């Protein structure tokens, strides 16, 4: 009898229940369709925007700081590298970070360290990966920068957003008071502002810290386009300032640029007290000046020194000698051939003229330089070569090398390999 009951249920009852369920879902779907059919175009757009704003809020969830990333993120699992940042701690450790997977919505951040001036490097020892199979659109950690502040604390700034850029972005930071220890302790992630940043902060003569964040002059990628219209007045380079050693950051000024791209702006303080901002555009490097520590900015223009550069990241930084350092694509100051070759230049007049022209890498497909100056005057520059399946490269040189146009310092080395992915991309 029990077998007959089970047979009856399987053959007759369950199909009926399934059909009833399908019928109910069909009715519900028709009701939903009717609801949308009654909406005007403006009402539909408003509905979509509200929905995408809820999805975008997934980027507001603090990411996990993974300090035990092996073996999941070992080099034999990696097939792509995009250079982000390099920095030295007070104890002499060098930290390096890069992007894995791709320059796309699936990217994540990895970091390694060196205790012998960049001769050898650890395996990945810190990873920030916002991806999750439980969310409808990919969460992206796409750019970042290490910076040692005047107190000796190491910062790692990074961007967490959705779908590469959701129209809002998100600049986050973690810090470590013991970055030279065997197991550094990192603070909980703190969201600083909308937008992102790829350049180190600058400490002004006033003691203020200036951070060149940027909110893309773009409404958002893909389904997020137009999701945050209230942020449109803030699109451009957002000059964030801290007067309390990074406890808080406040927006001081905004500078937009024509032909905008990923701004990747840099700020240095000139000897006359003005701030000099340089930024990436689709037409090359443009500049703007602030006479009041970042509140107001001049209309942007191409550099007075006629620095020719592709739409790609460059590097400008004040050295301890007082000179400015420039790292650019191309072997000549007034010429480039796309994202090929890197050269180093020095300025003794706050960027009006440049000397040197040391070619630190003569290969094609070299991009995204970042660097620092060690206490002994050695300049360290990291960048990527042939992103996937390429390498994160490192150059060590001095001001004397730049002025000579060749290596004259015994400790200088070029085209060193810091990170190389070992997995073959399918």
Where are these regions (language model features)?
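Hydrophobic h-region of N-terminal signal peptides that target proteins for export
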Residues: 10-18
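Sec-dependent signal peptide recognition
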Residues: 2-7
């Amino acid at each position: 009898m029990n077998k007959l009951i089970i047979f009856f249920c399987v053959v007759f009852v369950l199909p009926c229940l399934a059909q009833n369920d399908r019928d109910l879902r069909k009715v519900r779907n028709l009701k939903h369709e009717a609801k949308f059919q009654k909406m005007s175009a403006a009402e539909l757009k408003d509905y979509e925007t509200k929905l995408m704003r809820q999805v975008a809020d997934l980027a507001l969830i603090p990411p996990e700081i993974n300090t035990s990333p092996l073996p999941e993120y070992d080099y034999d699992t990696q097939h792509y590298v995009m250079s982000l940042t390099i920095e030295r701690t007070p104890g002499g450790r060098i930290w390096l970070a890069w992007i894995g997977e791709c320059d796309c919505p699936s990217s994540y951040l990895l970091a390694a360290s060196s205790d012998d001036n960049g001769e050898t490097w650890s395996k990945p020892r810190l990873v920030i990966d916002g991806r999750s199979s439980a969310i409808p659109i990919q969460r992206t950690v796409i750019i970042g920068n290490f910076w040692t502040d005047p107190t000796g604390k190491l910062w790692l700034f990074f961007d967490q957003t959705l779908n590469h850029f959701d129209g809002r972005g998100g600049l986050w930071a973690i810090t470590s008071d013991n970055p030279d220890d065997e197991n550094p302790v990192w603070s909980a992630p703190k969201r600083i502002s909308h937008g992102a940043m790829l350049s180190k902060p600058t400490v002004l003569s006033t003691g203020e810290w200036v951070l060149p964040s940027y909110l893309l002059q773009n409404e958002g990628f893909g389904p997020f386009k137009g999701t945050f219209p209230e942020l449109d007045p803030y699109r451009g380079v957002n000059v964030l300032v801290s007067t309390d050693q990074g406890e808080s950051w406040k927006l001081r000024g905004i500078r937009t640029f024509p032909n905008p791209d990923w701004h990747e702006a840099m700020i240095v303080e000139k000897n006359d007290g003005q701030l000099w901002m340089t930024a990436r555009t689709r037409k090359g490097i443009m500049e703007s000046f602030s006479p009041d520590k970042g509140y107001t900015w001049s209309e942007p223009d191409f550099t007075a020194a006629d620095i020719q550069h592709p739409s790609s990241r460059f590097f400008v930084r004040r050295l301890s000698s007082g000179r400015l350092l420039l790292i650019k694509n191309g072997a000549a100051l007034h010429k480039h051939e796309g994202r090929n070759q890197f050269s180093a230049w020095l300025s003794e007049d706050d960027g009006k003229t440049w000397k040197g022209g040391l070619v630190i890498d003569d290969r094609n497909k070299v991009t995204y330089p970042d660097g620092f100056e060690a206490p002994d005057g050695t300049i360290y520059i990291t960048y990527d070569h042939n992103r996937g399946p390429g390498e994160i490269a490192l150059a060590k040189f001095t001001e004397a090398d730049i002025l000579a146009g060749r290596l004259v310092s015994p400790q200088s080395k070029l085209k060193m390999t810091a990170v190389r992915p070992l997995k073959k991309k399918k």
